[in-house]
Amino acid sequence: MLFLGSGELGKEVTIELMRLGAWVCAADSYAGAPAQQVAHEYRVLDMANADQLRALFDEIQPDIIVPEVEAIATSELAAAAARGAQVVPSAEIAAICMDRERLRVLAHEELGLPTTPYRFAGSLEELREGAQIVGYPCVVKPIMSSSGHGQSVVRSADAIDAAWTEAQEGRRAHDEGDVSRVIVEALAPLDYELTVLTVSSSAGIVTCAPIGQRQESGDYRESWQPATFTPDVLEQAQHIARTAVEGLVAKAQASGEKGWGVFGVELFVLTDGNVLFNEVSPRPHDTGMVTMASQRLSEFALHARAILGLPITQEHVALSIPEGTVAASHAIVVQGDGEAEFRNVAAALAEPGTDLRVFAKPEVHGHRRMAVALAVGGDEADARAKAGNVAESLDIAIV
């Protein structure tokens, strides 16, 4: 089994796969990445370089390829799938989910899922026209980017030029001179966001309890499960998540692939109670780290089992915490330049119902997510406070 991307999420999936007897090689753009520290072997390469990726496939001859990042030469994934390798969840799904245009067309125009009003643009003039149609304020994003890169909120026509420039500079790796298409969509009256982890396996498709979240500049900072919402919101969220994943899996199966794995379906809940589709991550989701404290099987264990063809039923995705309680996660982001040394860990974990996962990334340059605090509490506020206290109690030195 070959991992493309060896971050903290891949590390947890690698551990779960090895518990089930899988042999794992973890690849990334640098040595010492979290999953590389626990895998049987590792490789370092530019995964967006088709020649390097093809050479890696020829060397390893993987039975299963697990993309854990988006900056990958997807043409080589498709070629590997054509040669008989199992790409997780599929080469076709990976290509769709990294392209906002293809994903939005599938979700809204083919599957009929509700979304914000949107337009696509391949030039500054088209962006101006699209923004006029969807109205201000609006959001402009590159077709291909992640973690909020290249995204901006535009409140008037005067800011459109700057938004176009931001999108071009923040898009995924590209050749100099290329122009990236963008999506411009109406800024919805958002109440909150949800993630619905949805699992496709040999037994079909099941959904986990929705996860609440807090973000900063497009990056996950906190999550909690189960989130609090009305029965109507739950029904809408589960329907949208299941329909989106069913549509993606159908695309995979049409190309002869399996489509098995965990999907993080991102949803907007509006102030009027309506739920909109936003995006899908075809792999375990950042916000799903809370499942290490909340579920019988974490999103990582579910992903590993689904990949290997084991059946996942609703019983496998059940919460493991006492009824009425809530689990929370709190990302620990470190700023500086050098190696991070964690101190005061014993005091930070003194409160019952708390835990910590240190990712052991080699260095920090600027700011980087280096660990996550976990907690179980009597309600959402209690769980979030306990996880936050763990994060605040740590003494993290840059050495």
UniProtKB/Swiss-Prot annotation:
InterPro entries: ATP-grasp, ATP-grasp_carboxylate-amine, ATP_grasp_subdomain_1, PreATP-grasp_dom_sf, PurT, PurT/PurK_preATP-grasp, PurT_C, Rudment_hybrid_motif
Top EC group: ligase
PROSITE patterns tied to this protein: ATP_GRASP
Binding positions (ATP): 100, 141, 146-151, 185-188, 193
Protein residues bound to Mg(2+): 266, 279
Keywords: ATP-binding, Ligase, Magnesium, Metal-binding, Nucleotide-binding, Purine biosynthesis
Protein name as it appears in the record: Formate-dependent phosphoribosylglycinamide formyltransferase
Taxonomic superkingdom: Bacteria
GO BP terms in the entry: 'de novo' IMP biosynthetic process
Oligomeric form and interacting partners: Homodimer.
